[in-house]
């Protein structure tokens, strides 16, 4: 059974989850804020490294036992020129781990709407409303 990593980097906290293919939670931990535009890229990478080590330790696995990971970063994609650097640094931090980076809104919509049509409103440290139509367009 494969182990999968999900990370939600936000303005108030960063949540780490390891689950198995069926979605069963193996481990979960929360660390401090990781918004690269506020806290800086180095802070985000430090929190990612620490959090992944912690959540894998709680799950009783080595980082190399993760099959893939999704890292949701607040503000990711808002400044397109920042994306390649963030992707490169995350890939260097976790060599060999297939990673996808995305905006925290993508993470939220996937979780709440299960990739189906609907509206999702986030009212956290920052606020935003999003929608996804029948055609899958956001």
Predicted regions and their residues:
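Conserved phosphate-binding catalytic cores of ATP/NTP-utilizing and phosphoryl-transfer enzymes
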Residues: 1, 96-121
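Glycine-rich phosphate-binding loop of actin/hexokinase-like ATP-binding domains
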Residues: 115-138
